[in-house]
């Protein structure tokens, strides 16, 4: 598994990258957008997932408790899985 893997179940969004697996309850997600800032500098407290170098796309997942910033080259596929 080289990149970020996203799986959506009935109740949660599961993000896997390297040896990490993050479970986010769907009811806690408030917004999913593309992040147009360089390296996500506006979201300093966000949990960063993926390699910041060598990737061009960033997806920001805002939740009630924590924000997540995904660095990816597969933006369309990941957004489709999240919004499905």
UniProtKB/Swiss-Prot annotation:
This is UPF0457 protein BC_3282. Pfam families: bPH_8. Belongs to the UPF0457 family. InterPro entries: PH_SunI-like. It comes from Bacillus cereus (strain ATCC 14579 / DSM 31 / CCUG 7414 / JCM 2152 / NBRC 15305 / NCIMB 9373 / NCTC 2599 / NRRL B-3711).
